[in-house]
Amino acid sequence: MKGCLATMDKELWIKRANDSLVKHFYEQQSDIEQREGFESKLTFGTAGIRGKFGLGEGRLNKFTIEKLALGLARYLNAQTNNPTIVIHYDIRHLSTEFAQIIANVLANHQIIVYLPDTYKTTPELSFAVRNLNTTAGIMITASHNPKDYNGIKVYSSDGAQLSTDASELVSRYIEEVGDPLQIDIPISKQNTSYIKPFPKSVTDDYMKHIQNMIGYIPKSDLQVVFTSLHGTSVPIVPELLKSLNFNQFNLVEAQCKPDPNFSSVQSANPEDHRAFDQAVELANKSHADLLISTDPDADRLGIAERDAHGHITYFNGNQIGALLLNYRIQQTSQLRHRLMIQSIVSSELTKSLARYNNVEYKEVLTGFKFIAQEIRQLDDHQNMIFAFEESYGFLSEPFVRDKDAVQIVPLIIKYASELKLYGKTLKDELEQIYQTVGRHEDTLFSHTLEGLEGKKKIESIMTHFRSNPPQEIQGLKVKAIEDYLTSEVYQLDKDTTSQIDSPKSNVIRVLFDEGFIALRPSGTEPKIKLYVSLKCPDFDDVAQKINAMIFS
């Protein structure tokens, strides 16, 4: 009977294919991919919804977007009288169309919608929510995912992504909508009057906040190459740099044009060195010193440095975090009660640097919304000077409540330009940090374990660490094990257990005197990540052996 219903359901969807906006994507998919759309449902989680285009409730299409929008409209009207919202969207396939669909549904429920006429960055959306004082915000993006993906992120009134509790409530409202093929959205002039143009003044204010944060960029002969990886950071980043009287940059022209197919990049992810290939070519031709890339929605940023011999040094997210924290510590020496916030899987290096400079630090779960929650709870006397995640997400000043590559680009250029005046590089500065607080090193192993066997393997690894805590790993003596699923920390040397003040998450962190390792399964994919952050000789060898021991 279930198979018959699935077949009927598929037939109904195929009949509506011409109206779905995704017929072309569906027709390009394999039989398995097509079937997945009918055998699963998109779920609204803590990071919103992200998925492939296609037919069925397990894919993004006109009807599933209408269902999401209707659930969100009911949620907003239940939360407050006369709700308002601002929508931004990136350069991906159907981002513009999805934005208009959502705006129409919300307007149909008497919700005022601010909708721009062009693509915008994610940090601009976070700022706009705060600047316009709206009830919520929506960002339509799938960050650096492949071209056949898109997604919807929802923001609360403080410009941060929805809390876990709010996300669960929105999810329930969406589910209560029922069959997306049965939704009827009447559109009238009276309703569309609720859709307002996005004020240019908001973008101007955002630029002013960054200009005030940077002040000026000192004159040096620093040369920069920049790529937006076909995303949203052009034109805003070049305009911002020019407004700060910095013109010594070249754009990777082929990659600085919006392109939903990401035609000129193997990967639109700044974590991936391949994303820099064309930037390296241009840097060699122009003898540039600094290479910067942003991901398609401009919330994350990667950097590399070219020396006089043409050698390229790529910095990982933790190293960029350490450099930026070091610079912010220098910039804010006059402030008291300084605070740095980072995720629990980010480096020991930045914590050591904070301690050395008498800067308080806090650790939060992975996900920038948890950093935003800490910012929201700051006392009046606390000064947040920097926040970051090892996955290349950084925030210098909290007028934005999400990762913000746009404000970081001129900050890193200013830092590099100052160093250039003294004949130094970012690589030199990182080496100085190591000499000051020790050579803490970091690496990440990501394992994809498909199918039922893979799921069992992931569960087995996590269960083993919970039920049989190791005394030592590769000669490193275990001090404590933090289990964020039970919110408990077990101190091995004292044989005591205490509570962790944190929301629950399926993460285990094993602490040593030398640093930590952390295990974190994905909530949506058949993946598990191992983070290694240690100060020890032969780091690479030790990290590889730890990985082999756990996943053999």
Curated annotation (Swiss-Prot):
Record's catalysed reaction(s): alpha-D-glucose 1-phosphate = alpha-D-glucose 6-phosphate
Gene3D superfamilies given in the database record: Alpha-D-Glucose-1,6-Bisphosphate, subunit A, domain 3, Alpha-D-phosphohexomutase, C-terminal domain
One record GO biological process: purine ribonucleoside salvage
Needed co-factor(s): Mg(2+)
Pfam families reported for this sequence: PGM_PMM_I (PF02878), PGM_PMM_II (PF02879), PGM_PMM_III (PF02880), PGM_PMM_IV (PF00408)
Sequence positions that bind Mg(2+): 143, 295, 297, 299
Pathway annotation: Glycolipid metabolism; diglucosyl-diacylglycerol biosynthesis
Enzyme class: isomerase
Active site: 143 (phosphoserine intermediate)
Highest taxon listed in the record's lineage: Bacteria
Keywords, alphabetical: Carbohydrate metabolism, Glucose metabolism, Isomerase, Magnesium, Metal-binding, Phosphoprotein
CDD domains: PGM2 (cd05799)
The record's free-text note on cofactor binding: Binds 1 Mg(2+) ion per subunit.
EC number: 5.4.2.2
Molecular function terms, GO-annotated: magnesium ion binding; phosphoglucomutase activity; phosphopentomutase activity
Family from the record: Belongs to the phosphohexose mutase family.
Its job: Catalyzes the interconversion between glucose-6-phosphate and alpha-glucose-1-phosphate. This is the first step in the biosynthesis of diglucosyl-diacylglycerol (Glc2-DAG), i.e. the predominant glycolipid found in the S.aureus membrane, which is also used as a membrane anchor for lipoteichoic acid (LTA).
Protein name as annotated: Phosphoglucomutase
Origin species: Staphylococcus aureus (strain MRSA252)
